[in-house]
């Protein structure tokens, strides 16, 4: 794509529009009070912010911490009209002080910098810079609520930057077009080498992230361990946005695992799945749906049963997370009680999968102590419902490296099961 066309795309996407709804005003669950969260997987909810600020994860993904604080500071000091005067990140319209505006401005600067690197023949620097641009655009779109017009435009830029980086990176990255229900969604496969068949890990994140956010998992963990990594978005998110989230959380993953046999480089006898948060619900479910195609399934802080069946646990969730769940389910303007009445159907225990029979796929349930989403009993359900299963609860301190400690444990498990 030429520089001019890229510029035109950005200008076209973010051209001023009337009546663009601000993110926090999209779902509007009735009579809802927000709670706080503070943990390694989700980040921190802070007074005065609608969004949960995922500082440690964003830094880990490649966001510059000084730049991040400057962005947040510009939002905080803005005098523009807000949806809620008490919430700093609710400036209305694509203008200075607006969450999406501030993050996309930095993403655009990085895109321009990357083009300069390309012209100078510095492809590796250009690839790294484009990956960073993709992360800034993804944070701009966070938490990826359906119907958020500006966020959808930021997602387009995130995907564009990620695709451009793929063409330049020394790593081997390809797209996989997966057909399902007469439509197609895209997954990405990341390859440490292409001269042999590789053990492969399918990965899905939560409901508030894009598959491009998972790049660091490949670079720091799967790639060095010799695993190929295949990512896909959860239903209703990113490349999978044309499918609503239903209690059949694993249906897109099932379509992928059924078609992955046709993908070069993948050792079909050594395929695993890892899911984070709601992605873990899909991962464990897939183990029951496709036990002959998977060697192991892993839940990292998964929304498996407890959170979905105990309304009191949702009382400890920030409003943003409840908005995300409601958005994925297509529930707008409903009461909290109406929302929670639908969630038990997502419980893998209520679906008759966990706690009733053992599947031959060894499964790992892992979380940090005091996890607000995944209780120890959830991991124990996973352990008891699979032959060779295991439940692990890691210390929740130090907070900043909880993600790393979890992934080290995951890699050790995969090396054993995919040997």
From Swiss-Prot:
Catalytic activity: a carboxylic ester + H2O = an alcohol + a carboxylate + H(+)
Keyword Hydrolase: yes
Domain of life: Bacteria
Record EC number: 3.1.1.1
GO molecular function list: carboxylesterase activity
Any Pfam family matching the protein: FrsA-like
SUPFAM superfamilies: alpha/beta-Hydrolases
Keyword annotations: Hydrolase, Serine esterase
Enzyme class: hydrolase
Keyword field contains Cell cycle: no
HAMAP family hit by this protein: FrsA (MF_01063)
Cited function: Catalyzes the hydrolysis of esters.
Annotated PANTHER family: DIENELACTONE HYDROLASE DOMAIN-CONTAINING PROTEIN-RELATED, ESTERASE FRSA
Family: Belongs to the FrsA family.
Name this polypeptide is given: Esterase FrsA
Species name: Photobacterium profundum (strain SS9)
